[in-house]
Amino acid sequence: MNKSERKRMLCVSLAAGAILLCGVLLVLLMRYQHTSTVRPQDQYAGQIPDFYSTVDADGDGVDDQTDVLDNALAYVDTRPKYKSRYYQTGYPDDGYGVCTDVVAFALKNAGYDLQALVDADIREHPQWYDIRQPDANIDFRRVRNLKVFFSHTAVALTTEVSETEEWQGGDLVIFEKHIGIVSDRRNRDGVPYVIHHNSPWQSAYEQDILEKRTDIVGHYRISE
């Protein structure tokens, strides 16, 4: 191969590399902060009765369980972008959010102001929380605090994913460093999907993740 041919091959290789790099960057740009709101199909062929709460905290004619589920879906339908920020208002108001905001907005619009409730609980039971200085604007948006709060204010349920009938749309599921709302749709094995917000690279807000996680530490229902 002469000098001219080597130069031509080098140019071709560089061009191919540039095209490949542009393609990768394009895919990344299309994925970053572009989480889909499209709901996965309910694939379970069996019959699992839905649970309905006897409580309607906000008096809107919709029971708590249904309210929490509907509100979680309504929140992610606004397509919040993932970013951890501090807000003087507590609740994000700029189109950004994290995993705890899915739960906070789902409960808020069902009659449960998590910001006020968690702050009151921290001040009443400071020994239960590892917090040096309480801050109502952020404490309710931390998973570690919600673990403590729900452990004694909500209805505790099984963490065994195989007990599929015990997992109902509108339930809360807590992982070691993450939290979400259980969906009313299920995979082929009857395991429900989870409505959550975990990353700016997340492909969809509602995903089949329960069986894949090994760090489930809590499963709760807001009311009976």
Give, region by region, the residue ranges found by the protein language model.
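N-terminal capping segments
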Residues: M30-K147
